Amino acid sequence: DRLRSRGLGDVYKRQVCIAAEHQRKGYGKRLIEHSFQRAVELGYDTVVIFGSPSNYVSCGFQSCEKYNICVEGGKYPAAMMVKELIPDVLDGRKWFYHDSPVMAVSEEEAQRYDDMLEKLEKKWQPSQEEFYIMSHSFQE
């Protein structure tokens, strides 16, 4: 089976960004929980994300392996997590996650778009390396 929202199409959440002075106050978690409510209202039953587990487990996300959801080749990415919005909707079957073509953005196109925006200072955060490691690691 292909992991889909029962014919509803896909919804994408790229990032939840909270200004540094407001982090660790629960705002990100509240935004995510609100998105769950909205998704259920729209008829969605499952959320699959790629992220750092330390940011999402407290919102109810669990390892994709626990739900038997893998990527091509039967691999379970360490950064791929799942939250059932409707309990037991995935019913123990094996599911395959496939990226949407919408997610394939070229670096050149992204740079052209960025060039139209107000210039901001680019920064590097340790969490970026953490995510890189997690997103290139697999559970066995």
Place the predicted regions along the sequence by residue.
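Conserved active-site alpha-helix within GNAT-family acetyltransferase domains
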Residues: 41-44, 51-75
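Conserved acetyl-CoA-binding loop-helix of GNAT-fold acetyltransferases
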Residues: 13, 18, 24-39, 48-49
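Short, hydrophobic beta-strand segments that form beta-sheet elements in well-ordered domains
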Residues: 46-49, 81
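Short beta-strand element of the conserved SAM-dependent methyltransferase core
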Residues: 17, 81-83
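Single conserved hydrophobic/aromatic residue that forms the stacking wall/gate
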Residues: 1-12, 56
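Acidic/histidine-enriched, glycine/proline-rich intrinsically disordered or flexible terminal extensions
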Residues: 88-140
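Short hydrophobic/aromatic beta-strand or adjacent loop that forms the aromatic wall/cage
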Residues: 76-80
